[in-house]
């Protein structure tokens, strides 16, 4: 095993992981018999504890990949190469499999009302009215196990919920739980460190080893987005935070080797869907279906990039991601990754999907979808007293075919986005910034190297491009790659903030915006009229 490479990959993964996945991973370690990790918030340190307990680096990697993928964490293809293709959580760690399975079942309930009803039922019937809102979902599942509500091979207490929401869940789990523990690597609750030769501790040479949730709650002045059903919901106190996740059980990963995709599949792909951040990728992957004749979406690591191949609406597509970390956001990484994917596939169209910031809060509202007919490159600028000027004055035009397809939304498209089960509205009142329907605008976007969260700087951008509706970071690079390969490109992103110094207060709008942009593109690509593009 290449320990140095694994350390590097785990460092990168730990930097990207959110609090929800840390909570789930900590729960899985509890199921593996590892104690005393309640306060640990670093995935890297948690992995270190697992590796010390097992004494087997490959097993620890296999365990980690299984947990993260089960709950939609993406960008793991390279780390998966070091995992064992034969790893089986049910036989190796049956308690962890139970805890993860029940957590997944409860998280998959949507809309939020159904999930809340299920938790209320469990709490009132089995836990004497335990306040499930006082803990996170993984912590609640741990309470269920500790109180004997669920046991290895026995989730009959949830039978009525299973029959109502997911009939196949019980049978699937029971089949797995029949596996014997022969040759199992299960660490029992009573096991001590003396019984297992400890693995060498992987040094954590990063500046910090903790990953915590963003601090600060949205202020009363910032309206909150409609809750997106179908995602995961971490319940803490009276606050519900939506975190949408891709169900990776529909994905096949080429572990340790690259799966050969037939030339027919490669030639049939006309669309490249480009994302930058993890939330943007999740919004797309949640809607990606297996290709015709396949049971699973294909996940590959080729040419140094993670690829996802499946069907988006009526079309086979390849999905790419340019920013696994914050430091990879921007035009240059986006151009580099897009070019690498274009070397493998020969799509006719590139669609960048994700989140942007609104330039004019009076015209463009939080959650609105922006279809770019042009991208103004503000990477090359001249800074003058009190203003900035674009040195490239001509904005790049989006592809004519793509603009024609996406620029004039039919009324039912807006309604579909607003009323889809993925955008189930739970708030009783709505205003201009928290509307029941998502509005769609078509116009120029600026592409800038800066993550803008300053009203004065945004004003300078607005003076440089007064016609711009929104701004983002990757479009200029994607347009350059499209120009190099002589294909059409367009940027379709939804407004996640207003770049006015309140980014933390707007943070709940980001996952909603990811979903809105992904859903808008899906609705068009699912139209029969696009089949012959």
From Swiss-Prot:
It comes from Amphimedon queenslandica (Sponge). Keywords: Hydrolase. Gene3D superfamilies: Nucleoside phosphorylase domain. Disulfide bonds: none annotated. It catalyses: ATP + H2O = D-ribose 5-triphosphate + adenine; dATP + H2O = 2-deoxyribose 5-triphosphate + adenine. GO terms for biological process: L-methionine salvage from S-adenosylmethionine; nucleoside metabolic process. It comes from the Eukaryota. Residues 236-248 have a biased composition (Low complexity). Residues 184-248 are annotated as: Disordered. This is Death domain-containing ATP nucleosidase. Residues 218-227 have a biased composition (Polar residues). One of its GO terms (molecular function) is methylthioadenosine nucleosidase activity. One of its GO terms (cellular component) is cytosol. Has 2 domains, an N-terminal death domain and a C-terminal purine nucleoside phosphorylase (PNP) domain; the PNP domain has ATP nucleosidase activity. Expression of the C-terminal domain alone leads to cell death in E.coli.
